[in-house]
Amino acid sequence: MTRINLTLVSELADQHLMAEYRELPRVFGAVRKHVANGKRVRDFKISPTFILGAGHVTFFYDKLEFLRKRQIELIAECLKRGFNIKDTTVQDISDIPQEFRGDYIPHEASIAISQARLDEKIAQRPTWYKYYGKAIYA
C-alpha cells in the first residue's frame, strides 16, 4: 500500500508522516518502470478527482511535480521533528517525460477526504498515534 495524503505535512501524526515519507517515492519508481515499458499517461485510467483505494496511486501518475514538492516538505518536517531519517535527497524527475510531471493543487473537498481517512485511522487506535512524540489522545 502506498499512502499519499493531502493534509498539510505539519499536521500529520508522526506515524502518518513517516509512512508517507517512506512510501511516496515508490510512485516515482512505478512511473519510471511504466515509461521504460513504453507507457504514456493516456494508457492509464486516471481519475479526474482525488480518490482513495483502487486508483489512488494512479491518480498521481501525471502529478509527479506535486509529489516531488511534497517529498521536500515531508523530509523537512521529519527533520524538524527530530526523526532520524537516512534519505534526505529528493528524486530528480527530469528523466521522466513531461506529461507525467504535472503539478496539482488539491481542492478542499479532496483535502477533506484525505483528512477523514487519517481521522478514521487515528480513531481506531487513539492512544497509539503521536504528534511530536506526544499522544494525540491520552
UniProtKB/Swiss-Prot annotation:
Transmembrane segments: none annotated. The active site is at residues 2, 23. It catalyses: Cleaves the N-glycosidic bond between the 5'-pyrimidine residue in cyclobutadipyrimidine (in DNA) and the corresponding deoxy-D-ribose residue; 2'-deoxyribonucleotide-(2'-deoxyribose 5'-phosphate)-2'-deoxyribonucleotide-DNA = a 3'-end 2'-deoxyribonucleotide-(2,3-dehydro-2,3-deoxyribose 5'-phosphate)-DNA + a 5'-end 5'-phospho-2'-deoxyribonucleoside-DNA + H(+). It holds the Pfam family Pyr_excise. Changing residue 42 to Q: 25% decrease in DNA glycosylase activity. Monomer. This is Endonuclease V. It comes from Enterobacteria phage T4 (Bacteriophage T4).
